[in-house]
């Protein structure tokens, strides 16, 4: 097997391990690490389990059995994200790798965090360790897209999400229709998937009309996980701030500024779902404030209603799923 294929095989294992930290590692990135002996056996592996605790590299070295310690000098460590080179809540992982005397390091992608940005790789190379960077780089970046966007765009990763009928309506018109009930588009399975999605995001936003007409709880009820921070956006609000644990903001600019201020505390918002309504969703699209769009389409139609937002031109389909309703996920080109 070629070295490139070997490196990709072990990096896929790193990615597999990293995903175990999806809920508890935040706001840190998900990272996996695998230590492979010179004869191709995995002698240690780990992932970043929880924010404030040991990183993936630390846990991988801890898992190495005492009888295998002597193999480290000829071993390769695979890491899905560049090892940190600064003191935070834990010591630098780059220092640990150097101290352990590893022969080679394979890194999936460079860490965009301002305190790292290649410094970990440089430190390890200066110690005489052979370093390869960029193995499965796209997959490694996509795994931590929320972390990447926060550190490169200075804002949270933003997912726009709505459900629509087959003819493109997201709800009944409250002006032209006598129907006062909420239009039920999602089915039992897709509702569960919505709650799973909420558990993975830090905050969820709706506009004033949706808040006043539907009073959505926006909580995680059909999946295990922490409730996201509820945010309501309306230009009619004079003041920004919290009321009964709900964050109210009056503009997109104020939203980003408030979130960035909050990110200086322990209650960071690294990812945001925007659920509507149509005017609110369109305002994010028009402002270019989005990274992913997720549309659920039911097979039925209604004669009249509130039209779904217009999709931007710079999009590409990531995946299509079918659960009775069709879910299409788009990303920015």
Q: PLM features: what roles do these ranges have?
A:
Residues 37, 151-153, 331-333:
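Active-site beta-strand termini and strand-to-loop segments that position acidic
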Residues 116-117, 142-144, 217, 303:
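Short Asp/Glu-rich motifs
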Residues 32:
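Helix-turn-helix
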Residues 144-155:
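Flexible, polar/acidic helix-loop-strand segments at domain edges
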Residues 2-28, 44-45, 68-71, 89, ...:
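Enzymes that bind and transform nitrogen-containing heteroaromatic metabolites
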Residues 121, 137, 141-144, 191-194, ...:
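Hydrophobic, well-ordered secondary-structure segments
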Residues 122-126, 149-151, 221-224, 310-312:
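Short, hinge-like loop/turn segments at secondary-structure boundaries
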């Amino acid at each position: 097997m070629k070295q490139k294929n070997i490196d990709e095989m072990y990096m896929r294992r790193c990615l597999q391990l990293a995903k175990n930290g999806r809920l508890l590692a935040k706001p840190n990135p998900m990272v996996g690490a695998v230590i492979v002996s010179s004869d191709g056996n995995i002698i240690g592996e780990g992932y970043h389990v929880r924010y404030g605790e040991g990183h993936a590299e630390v846990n991988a070295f801890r898992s190495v059995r005492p009888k295998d310690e002597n193999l480290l000098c000829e071993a390769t460590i695979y890491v899905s994200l560049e090892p940190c080179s600064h003191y935070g809540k834990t010591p630098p992982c780059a220092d640990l790798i150097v101290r352990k005397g590893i022969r080679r390091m394979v890194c999936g992608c460079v860490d965009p965090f301002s305190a790292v940005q290649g410094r970990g790789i440089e430190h390890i190379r200066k110690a005489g360790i052979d370093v390869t960077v960029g193995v499965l780089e796209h997959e490694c970046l996509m795994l931590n897209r929320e972390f990447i966007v926060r550190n490169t765009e200075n804002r949270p990763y933003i997912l726009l999400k709505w459900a629509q009928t087959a003819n493109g309506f997201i709800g009944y018109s409250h002006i032209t229709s006598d129907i006062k009930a909420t239009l039920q588009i999602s089915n039992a399975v897709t509702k569960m998937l919505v709650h799973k999605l909420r558990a993975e995001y830090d905050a969820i936003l709706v506009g004033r009309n949706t808040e006043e007409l539907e009073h959505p709880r926006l909580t995680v009820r059909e999946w295990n996980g922490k409730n996201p921070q509820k945010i309501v956006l309306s230009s009619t609000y004079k003041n920004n701030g919290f009321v009964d644990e709900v964050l109210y903001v009056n503009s997109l600019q104020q939203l980003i500024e408030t979130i960035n201020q909050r990110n200086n505390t322990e209650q960071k918002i690294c990812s945001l779902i925007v659920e509507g309504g149509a005017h609110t969703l369109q305002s994010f699209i028009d402002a270019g404030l989005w990274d992913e769009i997720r549309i659920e389409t039911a097979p039925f139609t209604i004669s009249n209603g509130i039209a779904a937002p217009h999709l931007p031109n710079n999009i590409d389909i990531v995946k299509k799923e079918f659960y009775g309703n069709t879910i299409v996920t788009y990303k920015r080109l």
